[in-house]
Amino acid sequence: MAAAHTIDLTLAHGGTLRGTLDRDRQIAVFRNVPFATVPKRWRAAVKKAPWTGILDATKQGPIIPQDPSIMPVWKLAPEKGSDFDELNALNLNVFVPISALKNETKADPIPVMTWVHGGAFTWGSNADPLYDAVNFVQHSIQLHLPVIVVTINYRVNVFGFLASKELQEELEESPEHSSLSLYDRSIGNWGLMDQKLAFEWVRENIASFGGNARNVTAFGESAGSASLHYHMVLPSHHGLFDHAIMQSGTIYALPPERVHKEGQAHFDTLLEHLNIPLSLTSREKMRRLRSVDQLELLNATRSLFNVRHPCLDNGKVFPALAADGSRPYTIQVAARDIIAYDPILKSVLLGSTKDEGTAFSRFFGDCNLQAWPSLLRQLVPFAELDAEAERVYGVPKTDADVERIFSKLIGDAGFSYSTHVIGDTLLRLQSARGADQFKLLRYNMDVGMNKLDEMQLGLGATHGVELPFIFGAPKLRALFTEKELRLSKEMQRLWISFAYQEYYEAMASSDGIRVPQVENGEAFVMTNTHEIKIGRSNRLTEAQRAFWNRLAQMQLATADILV
């Protein structure tokens, strides 16, 4: 018989789990729940087979080998102590109200929120203290809007995103090739494919926890948000969730690469770093690369790649041709085509932070007047646009000006502009389907966190700053000021009520807040007075939008487009 502080649960498609009871919060937590296994490095994962006996789900499971995050927000409570295991880290954590588990008839299942972490497809896991959802779920109970939160792992860095002709040839020559589906023959997209398996696990098993398998809200930040965008527009990934909250990330921020170009260049660089001769046969290269220990492989990537990308694969995960068959598939074009979006997608809450770029500017080298021309070129590859960029964003006169202007350019290039583009696309989707079939809401995070500015002056509402507010995780809650804690609870209320699709009523309050009219350019705004108000959704001026539109058109017109 289970001890008083644990609880046993039998899944519909799996086995029996033993989780932990938190009676103070009235929740149960099941950690290290396996949803898939990896048969070997650089192969598609397979669903976890049912097991006999009781599986211990009281402790955090292993994670994919990775370095600590280099982003400021994650330094508030860095992940420490988790085991690395590239083959057995596809696990998830489930945070569930005890009341949902006691609902034996499962007659009134509750909404589910599945979290996909960010980290540039290079780091991140469900072990990050930032994503501990115990307080989030407790608050949902207090609001009488109980939800289940699921946090997932997926393969990152070269374990989840690596592509080359050698990987392709080795798979094609392998004994298992003929038994694999066309989809599972994809290379370079294992991280996205892992996510798909996790969402499928939720659909198949969450009813056992008292969750509604037909009311799943996916939410993610940065690469996690970009992942959700991929799932929305890739036909092979449709049907995974019903609603989505996209936080600071779209396909445009992390577009797919090509096997023969960017993928091959990264692969060759990795081999050179590991002293594997490029003159060897594909089979011998792969034999040597597979023999490299997971930590040695991680170390080899440390100075080589800061960001990973999915990879175009000629009709496996990514379509080979556009929907009308007239041209090669280009996801940057598909992302603006409302026909491409998942037909079961019912709503999206879309937003970003005001000062996204302050977290990234230091990664580009010195930000000073001497470096300004080269800094500008990294974001604006066409010299004929330099004058327009300086007219729109300003000409720096001091080193401080360079830091400020460059941070703004980074934020707009990577986040504000793409959020604007996708916001316009989803608004067209709402108009085409009707607001009763699809609804778009917008938010803007315009306030920072006092503790972050103490760590690094000038961060402001930097990339990822909303995460401590949304999760209110135990290791971070003590860092809040009183006003920040109040805002955290209000943001949790908005996120939770979105999962219930009851934001009209849930956001009504004595101060007269109402649901923003997105078609009129409105959004929920988390202000620097630590309140949620209605404000303008678009962060860009008309001149800034025109500048980025022109740059995007020039990129699409070049022969180097990602096809």
Residue spans for each PLM region:
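Non-catalytic accessory segments of hydrolases
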Residues: A2-N189, A213, T481-L487, E502-Y504, ...
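Active-site rim elements
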Residues: A77-G81, D184-N189, Y252-R258, N275, ...
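Short, solvent-exposed loop/turn and secondary-structure capping segments
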Residues: N103-K106, W123-P129, G160-K165, H229-H231, ...
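Active-site loop/turn elements of alpha/beta-hydrolase fold enzymes
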Residues: Y154, F161, G249, M445, ...
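Substrate-access "cap/lid" subdomains that shape
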Residues: L197, E204, S208, V233, ...
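Alpha/beta-hydrolase fold nucleophile elbow
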Residues: F209-E221
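Glycine-rich nucleophile elbow surrounding the catalytic serine of serine-hydrolase chemistry
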Residues: G220-Y230
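Mobile gating loops/cap/lid regions near enzyme active sites that modulate substrate access
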Residues: S416-H420, D424-V563
